[in-house]
Amino acid sequence: MHLTTEKELINMNDLTTIDTNNYAEMAKAMGIANEAPSQKKQGMFLARLRINHSPILGSDTIKVKGGTYKLEIPDGPTYYAESAVMRPFLQRFMYKKFVMGSAGTPNRYVKTVMADTLNMDLKDNDGGFNCGKPSGWIEDFKSLPDATKELIRSIKRVRVVLGTVELVNPKDADGNPVDLGTTSFIWEVENRDAFKTVGNVFTQLAKMKRLPVQHNVTLNTEERKLPNGNSFYVPNTSLDVTNSVELTQE
């Protein structure tokens, strides 16, 4: 049994001078500083750049055409533009797989961590690796079981680009012009042709021994037709190699 000493009684007497305007100090003195529920910290999220494949229709007009770029602001509106100027800071790679939901279970994505190469096993958010894709090089794809083939086909290679982007003549979802400055963004490029097209920008910069952050890339889109007559769009990139962006400490 712990006996209260005279010294401790003296410290307790100090509490008779209670400063209600200094909660932190008083809570520490009274032993309740660690009893408050932890506050969930809200993370910082980047705007997401995507290609908008379908037009946004009004009652009798097209408000936003298909084949535009859209910039989704976290907890905010989405803006659209036919062209954009991207300043890439870096690229990373990951695997991604769409999982269809069922009754009571929503659709979701399985994603791996990002890395600077896909030549390694990457931990995914399902507790496995590579979204279930077998490790190593597959020499004979045709010899694999059909279930394994379907699994591999369902897993996307994703090139993740981070940097800043400026939409050219941006509009809101109603087609109204808006003022929008340069915005930090993340772009997950998963279409096979788009993966290669955007990758060519980084390949060209590497051959020039230039850093991505030193150059701007103009983004447009190119229409592709599906057998059923529908359209989808892939990025069209133009790297500005003549002008270099000055790097500052800001």
Language-model segment annotations:
Residues 2-177, 226-244:
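OB-fold ssDNA-binding interfaces and closely related basic DNA-contact patches used
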Residues 244-250:
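Extended, charge-rich, solvent-exposed interface segments
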Residues 157-238:
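Extended serine/threonine-enriched, polar tracts that run as long, contiguous segments within proteins
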